[in-house]
Amino acid sequence: NLWQFEMLIMKIAKTSGFMFYSSYGCYCGWGGHGRPQDASDRCCFVHDCCYGKVTGVVVCGGDDPCKXQICECDRVAATCFRDNKYWFFPAK
């Protein structure tokens, strides 16, 4: 869920996803369009694409493969935020 994603970003990137990325560039936050504005916005673009590849209904619990795929999408995005400098590009 969104709160778990925030906690993962805080742990890996040492920053708040809500504060810095919830309304950033073209792809961070709800929806997405156009060309990513920078490397951080591209992290969000790739995250959106990753979620789009997960099929079926995501059900929390146990050995659900969809839950594992969603977690991996979130982990990759959090690592991407850590590895790419944040610039201020307000949502477009």
Swiss-Prot record:
* Summary of pH dependence: Optimum pH is 5.5-8.5.
**Which keywords does UniProt give here?**
Calcium, Disulfide bond, Hemostasis impairing toxin, Hydrolase, Lipid degradation, Lipid metabolism, Metal-binding, Platelet aggregation inhibiting toxin, Secreted, Toxin
| InterPro entries attached to this UniProt entry | PLipase_A2 (IPR001211), PLipase_A2_Asp_AS (IPR033112), PLipase_A2_dom (IPR016090), PLipase_A2_dom_sf (IPR036444), PLipase_A2_His_AS (IPR033113)
Task: State the compartments where it is located.
Answer: Secreted
SMART domains linked: PA2c
Question: What GO terms describe the biological role, i.e. biological process, of this protein?
Answer: arachidonate secretion; lipid catabolic process; negative regulation of T cell proliferation; phospholipid metabolic process
**Can you quote a single GO CC term?**
extracellular region
Answer yes or no on keyword Calcium.
Answer: yes
- Keyword tRNA processing found: no
According to the record, how does the cofactor bind?
Binds 1 Ca(2+) ion.
Enzyme class, top EC level, equals hydrolase
Q: Give a brief account of the tissues where this protein occurs.
A: Expressed by the venom gland.
Disulfide feature: C28-C44, C43-C80, C50-C73, C60-C71
Q: Which residues form the active site?
A: H47, D74
GO terms, molecular function: calcium ion binding; calcium-dependent phospholipase A2 activity; phospholipid binding; toxin activity
| Cofactor(s) the protein requires to work | Ca(2+)
The record's principal subcellular location, in a coarse class, is secreted
* Catalytic activity from the UniProt record: a 1,2-diacyl-sn-glycero-3-phosphocholine + H2O = a 1-acyl-sn-glycero-3-phosphocholine + a fatty acid + H(+)
Gene3D superfamilies, sorted: Phospholipase A2 domain (1.20.90.10)
How it assembles, according to the record, is: Monomer.
> What does this gene product do?
Snake venom phospholipase A2 (PLA2) that induces significant edematogenic activity. Shows mild cytotoxicity on Trypanosoma cruzi and Leishmania infantum. Also inhibits ADP- and collagen-induced platelet aggregation. Does not show myotoxic activity.
In which family does this protein belong, per the annotation?
Answer: Belongs to the phospholipase A2 family. Group II subfamily. D49 sub-subfamily.
Q: What is this protein called?
A: Acidic phospholipase A2 braziliase-II
Give the organism the record lists.
Bothrops brazili (Brazil's lancehead)
